[in-house]
A protein has these predicted regions:
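Nucleotide-activated donor-dependent transferases that construct or modify glycoconjugates
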Residues: 2-14, 36-37
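Short hydrophobic "strand-cap" motifs at the C-terminus of beta-strands
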Residues: 7-9, 164, 207-209
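Short amphipathic alpha-helix
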Residues: 17-27
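Active-site donor-binding segments of glycosyltransferases and PAPS-dependent sulfotransferases
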Residues: 30-99
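Active-site proximal beta-strand in glycosyltransferases
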Residues: 89-92, 103-133, 162, 181
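Membrane-proximal helix-turn-helix segments that form the acceptor-binding/catalytic region
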Residues: 130-161, 169
Length: 210
């Protein structure tokens, strides 16, 4: 009998990363989900109402007035407060809030499904783009240096890397010097149907996202 635990940044929105987490949870339905914090009643929380969710000791502080973004500097403390040493296998669904650096046992195997290294740490544009404000940029210069050290250190603790695209595979190698395997997020293709007529191609791209 293998003891399995799942880890995710936080339980709030139900986006693409959370859909992957749902599939992982369906594969291991008895595995508890450890997370930095959980917003009860949120769309994501409702999707995982049938699962055991374990919040970190810092959850109340992170949720208070929705301060988890400016309090990212607490991430090393948040994740180190979670002890997963009793598990044989830990699968972490990691992105902007790291979801790494937790305590593990000597024989614990850790697999990361990486949606992307934290975008705000490496100069990529984010959905909020708070660094357009000079105060945030000054704050980021100081804090992000230490978070990059934590990000690299916690990445070194992963046994196997899985990524969701070739682009993220390049980022994982660039920032962590780690090889990874691309496994695209699952799509229920049987629900799709072919177009009833030929689609005329025009000079634009259509992007659908939340």
């Amino acid at each position: 009998y293998m003891k399995v635990a799942l880890v995710h940044d936080y339980i709030k929105e139900f986006g693409g990363a959370e859909r992957v987490l749902r599939v992982l949870s369906d594969l291991y339905p008895s595995a508890p989900i450890y997370t930095a914090f959980r917003v009860k009643g949120s769309t994501c929380d409702k999707e995982f109402s049938d699962r055991k969710i374990v919040e970190s000791k810092w959850a109340i502080i992170l949720k208070y007035f929705n301060l988890y973004s400016p309090l990212r500097f607490l991430a090393p403390l948040v994740w180190s407060s979670i002890d997963l040493s009793e598990y044989d296998l830990v699968i972490t669904s990691c992105s902007s809030f790291f979801a790494r650096g937790f305590k593990t046992g000597k024989n614990t195997k850790v697999v990361a499904y990486c949606h992307t290294p934290p975008r705000f740490l490496y100069g990529y544009e984010t959905s909020i783009n708070l660094q357009r404000f000079w105060v945030v940029r000054v704050y980021a210069v100081v804090v992000n240096h230490f978070l990059r050290l934590f990000d690299y250190w916690s990445a070194s603790k992963i046994n196997n890397w899985i990524v969701n695209s070739e682009n993220v595979k390049k980022r994982v190698w660039k920032f962590y010097r780690k090889d990874s395997v691309v496994i695209y997020p699952p799509v229920e293709v049987e629900k799709l149907s072919k177009a009833s007529k030929e689609v005329k191609k025009e000079n634009y791209f259509l992007i659908v996202s939340r």
